[in-house]
Amino acid sequence: MFNALVVDKDEESGKTQAAVKQLSLTDLPVGEVTVAVEYSTVNYKDGLCIGPGGGLVRKYPHVPGIDFAGTVENSSDERYKPGDKVVLTGWRVGEAHWGGYSQKANVRADWLVPLPEGLDTRQAMAVGTAGFTAMLAVMALEDHGLTPGHGPVLVTGAAGGVGSVATAILAHLGYEVAAVTGRPETADYLTSLGATQIVARDEINETVKRPLESEIWAGCVDAVGGAMLARVLGQMKYGASVAAVGLAGGAGLPATVIPFLLRGVNLLGIDSVMQPYANRLRAWERIARDLPMDKLEAMIRPATLSDLPGLGADILKGQVQGRVVVDVNA
């Protein structure tokens, strides 16, 4: 028997309830690799899946957790053997498939990557989907020509998971980072990660008044979307790129095409769920190299399985700073 966070749904009321329960290996879905999970984390999607589902969870009972890291116990795939350390992010695990809020997991071998050299399983989950997405965003900006000499890079939702890691990576790479936050109390935290400028959310979270404003930003990692993204597009330098990674501020985009047509601005969509294996390895190698471990440690908030219902609600309200690392065995 082992512990897992199980979400059940009352069919009559439609309400969901999450609680730590004991399961057996026979309860797990079929998979090629059985992993003894050591750590997981909390992302925005996890908050949706712990709570009402947000349209992501179709079948109950369900075990959420879109990320996990641990040790292989059994494998029918020759790529992995017992004792191997592995990481999983994406592939709709924790949404359509049972996830990492459990001491055991059965998954497809194709969904795993080896634990990157230089990271332990706890650090890998401090990174998690949020940090993996942040690295993909930085890589996309670099692939579109961004270098530190081009000017300041804006990070929206900077105190959240994606924003925190993006800020730390960009600062380490020598960029001038402007961090947007709606919580003034996070300014010292963001400065400690390497931000050189703190931008109040209210300054930039307005509906577009003019399609083009002064050219300010050489690049942007946007975790907010909505009106803020629309406003930022009009402030980008000529030929600059915005990597869109989230929708904390809404899925709409009340913008015009003028920044694309007159300034050649690029809007880059970043998906972390279905990334090919080679890209995953490249991103994790970059994370191990370009994310300072002392900065990562400063982001970590420890948690246990029993903390998850509350944390799921908090992250949906934008009240979680940095990265939550869940010790599923504590």
From Swiss-Prot:
Pfam families hit by this protein: ADH_N, ADH_zinc_N
Phenotype when the gene is knocked out: 25-fold increased sensitivity to acrylate, growth is strongly inhibited by 20 mM dimethylsulfoniopropionate (DMSP).
EC code(s) of this entry: 1.3.1.84
Keyword Ubl conjugation part of the UniProt annotation: no
SMART domains reported in the protein's UniProt record: PKS_ER (SM00829)
Induction: By dimethylsulfoniopropionate (DMSP) and acrylate.
Record-linked CDD domains: MDR_yhdh
Catalysed reactions, semicolon-separated: propanoyl-CoA + NADP(+) = acryloyl-CoA + NADPH + H(+)
GO molecular-function term, one example from the UniProt record: acryloyl-CoA reductase (NADPH) activity
Entry's Gene Ontology cellular component terms: cytoplasm
Localization terms from the record: Cytoplasm
InterPro entries linked to this entry: Acrylyl-CoA_reductase_AcuI, ADH-like_C, ADH-like_N, GroES-like_sf, NAD(P)-bd_dom_sf, PKS_ER, Zn-ADH-like_protein
Keywords: Cytoplasm, NADP, Oxidoreductase
Binding locations of NADP(+): Y44, A159, G160, G161, V162, T181, G182, R183, R201, L247, S272
SUBUNIT field: Homodimer.
Note: The zinc-binding residues of the alcohol dehydrogenase family are not conserved.
Family as reported in the entry's similarity comment: Belongs to the zinc-containing alcohol dehydrogenase family. Acrylyl-CoA reductase subfamily.
Its biological purpose: Probably catalyzes the NADPH-dependent reduction of acrylyl-CoA to propanoyl-CoA. Restores acrylate resistance when expressed in an E.coli strain K12 acuI deletion.
Record protein name field: Acrylyl-CoA reductase AcuI
Organism, as annotated: Ruegeria pomeroyi (strain ATCC 700808 / DSM 15171 / DSS-3) (Silicibacter pomeroyi)
Gene that specifies this protein: acuI
